[in-house]
Amino acid sequence: MASSLLTSSVMIPTTGSTVVGRSVLPFQSSLHSLRLTHSYKNPALFISCCSSVSKNAATSSTDLKPVVERWPEYIPNKLPDGNYVRVFDTTLRDGEQSPGGSLTPPQKLEIARQLAKLRVDIMEVGFPGSSEEELETIKTIAKTVGNEVDEETGYVPVICAIARCKHRDIEATWEALKYAKRPRILVFTSTSDIHMKYKLKKTQEEVIEMAVSSIRFAKSLGFNDIQFGCEDGGRSDKDFLCKILGEAIKAGVTVVTIGDTVGINMPHEYGELVTYLKANTPGIDDVVVAVHCHNDLGLATANSIAGIRAGARQVEVTINGIGERSGNASLEEVVMALKCRGAYVINGVYTKIDTRQIMATSKMVQEYTGLYVQAHKPIVGANCFVHESGIHQDGILKNRSTYEILSPEDIGIVKSQNSGLVLGKLSGRHAVKDRLKELGYELDDEKLNAVFSLFRDLTKNKKRITDADLKALVTSSDEISLEKLNGANGLKSNGYIPVPQVSSNV
């Protein structure tokens, strides 16, 4: 499966050394300057930020290694400190439930390996009770990724799988996960009135009895790390949640999840729910509280952060936010929000995600699922570090922090100072001058004015001006033919989706 991806080594600067990383990028085969031949499904994924690639990188290692730091001892129901937030990735279970996003067994294994490079604390890799093939795939991940201990850091991911409150599901989950060093089962049931009435057709007491029986059965098989999930917790009665969670804790669970399964909660509402449960559930201080938010109202990231602010210390996310209906909370959004603002506005909370692996992971998931992100998707979209407005371009040229709050290098992208500038009708003279300088042209004011005038005329007919266009403007500025330029070395404006251009040595 890896053969379907283009991998190019890029140099990532770190303190005191150079680390070589893998960038997984889709390109158009027509981009001869890159000397690439593989055709990709969606050329709009082209990212401008990866515009500076070391010539020496091609002969170097292609695996990004995180900063060497010993991983904290793993105790299922305890955290190394009160500010640590465990990242529970469910791309391979909840994410795969995206319509049209199914994965083959080899693809699931490859993504699991990449999630380990990303350093997720827990990866939920599927539903063993759904089919024999799924069980065998999960077993393979448990035997391989679930046993690959990093010798330098001691890191090994927790391998988790989901089960309904049915003994056959729980038995299948044990059969799949028992080979992992750190197996975890997530037993779940619905807790909202509407689900209990119409889906389960059970009373509150019957649901509690079913949950407790399932937890005890999981323990009897050998699980000592058991997570209990409240499906549709966001619409559940608060006092019933306190009661069923209290009984689950008494039965021996290590983690409890409050699911906003239909994405109905507002951030303040969800935060208040977590606060209430932490204050009123017997034994809640002896387990880790997890948040699981869906994105039906576009609030999954905000709700997840609200839950963390209220004291939750496990956040459940997917790569690119894929998942049922409108998707789940996005790993890259939640993690980068905590990295960017956690120390300042959320009492110092943090994760141990190796954020330099985010872009490579995002690209892999997009390619394997066929679920491509829109250009303006936060963190990983093609336009995240791209600027066309002249005012913004001028600021970026002076100091990137004027209009960028995140560093592209932090998510595994290497950019030159000007590589995020897209030249179009909103671009100013300064940006054009700087791009020409990058191309090797030092123009006096008179010549620059002539070129810029032609540039402005050209933008009336083309949405994006290419480097080839700029060169033609310079060399033929006295007798340039706009008609000729419109067909020169670039796509015409009809149907053209503006995406950044990369100039790299691969």
From Swiss-Prot:
It catalyses: an omega-(methylsulfanyl)-2-oxoalkanoate + acetyl-CoA + H2O = a 2-(omega-methylsulfanyl)alkylmalate + CoA + H(+). Its main location: plastid. Its EC number is 2.3.3.17. InterPro entries: 2-IPM_HCS-like, AIPM/Hcit_synth_CS, Aldolase_TIM, LeuA/HCS_post-cat, PYR_CT. GO terms for cellular component: chloroplast. Keywords: Chloroplast, Phosphoprotein, Plastid, Transferase, Transit peptide. Highly expressed in leaves, flowers, roots and siliques. Not detected in flowers in PubMed:12432038. Changing residue 505 to T: In strain: cv. Sorbo. The modification Phosphoserine is found at residue 98. Determines the side chain length of aliphatic glucosinolate structures. Catalyzes exclusively the condensation reactions of both the first and second methionine carbon chain elongation. This is Methylthioalkylmalate synthase 1, chloroplastic. It comes from Arabidopsis thaliana (Mouse-ear cress).
